[in-house]
């Protein structure tokens, strides 16, 4: 199964947007680790990937989307509002990496300013992790 964001919303979006209390999002780190431990113990292979772009690259992508009639539906006022919280999201992501990277399910942060590189690196990361977990060389 592939989960996109999934249970990490509590320690990212909900934390930054104030949708939960500090007690709740702080507790979520433990709950996430416990849940992923259950998945791992039941035989799931967990690969966690974060595609990281720079603030400058995000701006370039936003402007490109706005200018393209085939893609401007992808950019909303909420995207611009969230961009203003870049530093808060970056801090929350850094906390998430530190607090939810057990040996059996570490985060892989991939530089993603160049989409082709990010795609190849993500596929390479998945293949290597699966190979290691399945004992394939």
Question: What residue spans do the PLM features occupy?
Answer:
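Functional cleft and adjacent loop/helix regions within the main domain
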Residues: 7-8, 40
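Short, internal active-site loops enriched in acidic
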Residues: 8, 53-58, 112-116
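Alpha-helical elements of the RecA-like P-loop NTPase motor core of helicases
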Residues: 10, 60, 120
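Loop/turn-to-beta-strand initiation segments
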Residues: 1, 43-47, 106
